[in-house]
Design a protein with these regions (language model features):
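ATP-binding glycine-rich loop module of kinase domains
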Residues: 27-50
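AlphaC helix of the eukaryotic protein kinase fold
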Residues: 44-62
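Conserved HxN/HPN-centered segment at the entrance to the catalytic loop
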Residues: 64-74
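Conserved short submotifs of the Hanks-type protein kinase catalytic core
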Residues: 80-96
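AlphaC helix of the protein kinase catalytic domain
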Residues: 97-107
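Activation segment signature within eukaryotic-like protein kinase domains
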Residues: 115-116
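Catalytic-loop of the protein kinase fold
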Residues: 127-146
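Conserved activation segment of eukaryotic-like protein kinases, specifically the C-terminal portion
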Residues: 171-182
Length: 183
């Protein structure tokens, strides 16, 4: 059994231009999110030239913070003759901030205070790394809310536009970014 075969797809959550995100379970019935990335569709700026690894997966391997979605597994697989990378994250019982705002018609000041505080803590953590990480592209579609407790806990996700500040090539992958959310 290959590493990716331990995960069984429950359903597709969303499709991107070069990736699909699935809800999966493992052999022990653990629930996870699996991001399957088509390597042929990536831009060269999404790879670390020194390691030939996808920057997003490489960065998430190095970080751990309560307001950042945790990557628990990653690797590569050949599926139907195509090369893919995958990143597995903990399943979060909740929804995207954008979905939450749409469903509720807004967000209370009380909830927003906790969301913003959590995001600022995550950004402070990223910026304080030995090689500071610039997230780029913070938007309501890249913030997952854990709704398992009374107060929503925000988690930054989708590091596809993130980069290390000390990286020799300071260009970043801009496709799909909104100028309103660049940071």
């Amino acid at each position: 059994i290959t590493a990716i075969e331990q995960y069984k797809v429950v359903f597709l959550l969303r499709k991107g231009s070069y990736y699909d995100v699935y809800r999966v379970v493992d052999n022990k019935d653990g629930k996870y999110f699996l991001k399957l990335i088509n390597l042929a569709k990536l831009d060269e700026l999404q790879f670390n030239p020194a390691t030939d690894q996808i920057c997003e997966i490489e960065m998430k391997r190095e970080i751990s913070h309560p307001n950042i979605m945790r990557q628990i597994d990653s690797g590569e697989a050949i599926i139907d003759g195509q090369r893919y990378a995958y990143s597995v994250s903990d399943f979060i019982p909740g929804e995207l901030l954008s979905e939450n705002i749409s469903r509720k018609g807004g967000c209370s000041i009380y909830d927003m205070k906790h969301i913003v505080t959590g995001l600022l803590n995550a950004l402070k953590y990223l910026h304080s790394q030995k090689e500071p990480i610039i997230f780029n592209g913070i938007s309501p579609n890249r913030i997952m809310l854990n709704l398992s407790s009374g107060t929503p806990i925000p988690l930054l996700m989708d590091f596809d536009h993130a980069r290390k500040l000390n990286k020799v090539n300071l260009k970043c992958y801009m496709k799909g970014l909104s100028p309103f959310y660049l940071a």
